[in-house]
Curated annotation (Swiss-Prot):
Any Pfam family: eIF-1a
Family indicated by similarity: Belongs to the IF-1 family.
CC per GO annotation: cytosol
Subcellular location, principal: cytoplasm
GO molecular function annotation: ribosome binding; rRNA binding; translation initiation factor activity
UniProt KW keywords: Cytoplasm, Initiation factor, Protein biosynthesis, RNA-binding, rRNA-binding
Gene3D superfamilies named among the record's database cross-references: Nucleic acid-binding proteins
Protein name per UniProt: Translation initiation factor IF-1
Subunit relationships: Component of the 30S ribosomal translation pre-initiation complex which assembles on the 30S ribosome in the order IF-2 and IF-3, IF-1 and N-formylmethionyl-tRNA(fMet); mRNA recruitment can occur at any time during PIC assembly.
PANTHER family xrefs: TRANSLATION INITIATION FACTOR IF-1, CHLOROPLASTIC (PTHR33370:SF1)
Function: One of the essential components for the initiation of protein synthesis. Stabilizes the binding of IF-2 and IF-3 on the 30S subunit to which N-formylmethionyl-tRNA(fMet) subsequently binds. Helps modulate mRNA selection, yielding the 30S pre-initiation complex (PIC). Upon addition of the 50S ribosomal subunit IF-1, IF-2 and IF-3 are released leaving the mature 70S translation initiation complex.
Length: 70
């Protein structure tokens, strides 16, 4: 059975080593996130200050995956 993932909007604060980012979420939590495969495949650039949507597993809310750049 597949668990539903949570998603929330945030702002990229800094780039960490390649495809990892520090993202400040709407609820003022600073988390580490990586880019999804489709963003990587389409070579979408994500820079500090970009507004993004981050998806989480319900099991680990400290790490996420960037699924959309606004």
């Amino acid at each position: 059975m597949k668990e539903t993932n949570l998603s929330i909007k945030g702002v990229v604060k800094e780039i960490i080593k390649g495809d990892k980012f520090k993202v400040l979420l709407e609820n003022n939590l600073l988390i580490e996130a990586h880019v999804s495969g489709k963003i990587r495949m389409h070579k979408i650039r994500i820079l500090p200050g970009d507004s993004v949507e981050v998806e989480f597993s319900p099991y680990d809310l400290t790490k996420g995956r960037i699924i959309y750049r606004h």
